[in-house]
């Protein structure tokens, strides 16, 4: 007897949808988001494995684990690129964005579904080329910044650097195509009441991120193309002997590189706003309009401060003064966001779900990273601390603890919506405790190393630094163990099939309200636009849905 197929199991034209068609040629936002999630988790685990190799080497003075200083720098380079382009960005922007943006704007899918599919399949090809550069010739040991002259002949004479540059081109193209899709979706698809200042904060964070990507990715592409031409076509864009200037590449790279920091952290801001609002039981975050303009201000200022990475290259006093002041000004909108989150928690019966643990941990750790950033924004201070472990500690507090805690917070909050099962709550809280202890033990001692003068990118060091390096390596082992524990938690949730009884979401949460009667939801939640009602005071929005569960 023929099996009756549900509509979700049918293709777009009524035929049975095969496994290959669903996952290789998918134009469904949820399937593509799931693919990004799988890819990002794999990239994150591989990048974390490389970081453990780095810390095993630095646990004791001398070449105790990695016998070659060149290979040490190859591992550092691959770790950075893997975590940025193939772990945090695929999960925070692409996976969560693909899953949630259509739900939050009231749309059926992304505005360009086929472009969405193209955006994903460029990413595995870029990942393959990155792995190929890691194993080709001697690998790329120039750091993720690939500064010339280290990235050109004769210092990188093999093909590995060329392969890496092509990988970055593909990764950048993937991000650019996805950003155009997100920006177009967020501009054109929201129902009327969800546009402008009334947009969901996560939607706004993805919109600002998409604009930053559209501005900065072409500049990176131009810079690395110039390196490719210097290496292969005898140009001298960055060679002083031919009239070039290596500092030009630093300007091009950091015009991309600093917005990239906000590209990584802004989606985490959106996740925190959603989770804190949910766990506080409130219909809107405190100071909603201030939060909107703070996020826009952070994105705008982020494009104007790139040269604070270059205080030691010989900038004149006026230029250093401008970039130092502009960098400090970013602390103002960032402070607005942090205190608005705290005010949202105030006066509420805060539900300490696992996601709430990650959100409160994020607030503490991101604040610490921001305070060390204020010190580094001073041009005179940065001259002493530039390229020391103080800088490593600063950006890992913002990224390894900010963006990554945003990833875990989002997974704990939205996994029931994505796959219909829940993590074990007690075990998830234990995972947070282990991760929180591990990352702090790893990176807080590195402030002391930097203040003592320990430089970055060296595999060996004086014995005086051995104690804090040992403590940092111990914390790294704890962090890696907590990641393995998370793999177990994910497996346990999928095997036990611990279903969702009810979402706990308020009526104003479109990500939950659209699928409130079934988890996970169908491939397309809305067959028609939802009806949206705003209260007279414009402080929050309540959503009323017609029954529209069909395709």
UniProtKB/Swiss-Prot annotation:
O2 binds at residue 262. Its EC number is 7.1.1.9. Its main location: mitochondrion. It comes from the Eukaryota. Keywords: Calcium, Copper, Electron transport, Heme, Iron, Magnesium, Membrane, Metal-binding, Mitochondrion, Mitochondrion inner membrane, Respiratory chain, Translocase, Transmembrane, Transmembrane helix, Transport. Ca(2+) binds at residue 62. Its cofactor is heme; Cu cation. There is a cross-link at residues 258-262 (1'-histidyl-3'-tyrosine (His-Tyr)). This is Cytochrome c oxidase subunit 1. It comes from Mytilus edulis. The gene is COI.
């Amino acid at each position: 007897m023929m099996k009756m197929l549900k509509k979700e199991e049918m293709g777009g034209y009524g035929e049975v949808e095969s496994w290959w068609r669903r996952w290789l040629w998918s134009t469904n936002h949820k399937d593509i988001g799931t693919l990004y999630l799988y890819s990002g988790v794999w990239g994150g685990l591989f990048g974390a494995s490389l970081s453990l190799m780095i810390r095993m080497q630095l646990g004791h003075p001398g070449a105790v684990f990695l016998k070659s200083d060149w290979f040490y720098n190859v591992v550092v380079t691959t770790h950075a690129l893997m975590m940025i382009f193939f772990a945090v960005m695929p999960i925070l922007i692409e996976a969560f964005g693909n899953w949630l943006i259509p739900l939050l704007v009231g749309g059926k899918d992304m505005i360009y579904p086929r472009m969405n599919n193209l955006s994903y399949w460029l990413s595995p090809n870029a990942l393959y080329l990155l792995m190929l550069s890691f194993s080709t010739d001697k690998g790329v040991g120039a750091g993720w910044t690939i500064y010339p002259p280290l990235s050109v002949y004769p210092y990188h004479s093999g093909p590995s650097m060329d392969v890496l540059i092509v990988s970055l081109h593909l990764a950048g193209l993937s991000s650019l195509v996805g950003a155009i899709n997100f920006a177009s979706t967020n501009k054109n698809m929201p129902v009327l009441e969800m546009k402008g200042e009334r947009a969901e904060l996560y939607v706004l964070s993805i919109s600002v991120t998409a604009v930053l990507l559209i501005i900065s990715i072409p500049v990176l592409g131009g810079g690395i193309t110039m390196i490719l031409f210097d290496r292969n076509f005898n140009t001298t864009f960055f060679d002083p002997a031919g009239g070039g200037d290596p500092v030009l590449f630093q300007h091009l790279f950091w015009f991309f590189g600093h917005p990239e920091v906000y590209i990584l952290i802004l989606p985490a801001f959106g996740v925190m706003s959603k989770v804190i609002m949910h766990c506080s039981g409130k219909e809107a975050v405190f100071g909603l309009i201030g939060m909107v303009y703070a996020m826009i201000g952070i994105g705008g200022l982020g494009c104007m401060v790139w040269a604070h990475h270059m205080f030691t290259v010989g900038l004149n006093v006026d230029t250093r003064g401008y970039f130092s002041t502009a960098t400090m000004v970013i602390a103002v909108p960032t402070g607005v966001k942090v205190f608005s989150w705290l005010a949202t928690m105030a006066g509420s019966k805060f539900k300490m779900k696992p996601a709430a643990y990650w959100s409160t941990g994020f607030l503490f750790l991101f604040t610490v990273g921001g305070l060390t950033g204020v010190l580094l924004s001073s041009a005179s201070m940065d001259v002493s601390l530039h390229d020391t472990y103080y800088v490593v500690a600063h950006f890992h507090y913002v990224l390894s603890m900010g963006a990554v805690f945003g990833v875990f917070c989002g997974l704990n909050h939205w996994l029931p919506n994505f796959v219909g099962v829940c993590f074990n709550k007690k075990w998830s809280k234990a995972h947070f405790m282990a991760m929180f202890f591990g990352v702090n033990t790893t990176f807080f001692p590195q402030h002391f190393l930097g203040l003592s003068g320990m430089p970055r990118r060296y595999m060996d060091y004086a014995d005086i630094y051995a104690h804090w390096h040992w403590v940092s390596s111990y914390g790294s082992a704890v962090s890696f163990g907590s990641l393995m524990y998370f793999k177990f938690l994910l497996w346990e949730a999928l095997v036990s099939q611990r279903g969702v009884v009810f979402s706990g979401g308020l009526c104003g949460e479109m990500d939950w309200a659209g699928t409130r009667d079934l988890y996970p939801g169908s491939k397309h939640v809305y067959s028609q636009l939802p009806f949206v009602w705003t209260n007279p005071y414009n402080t929050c929005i309540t959503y009323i849905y017609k029954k529209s569960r069909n395709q």
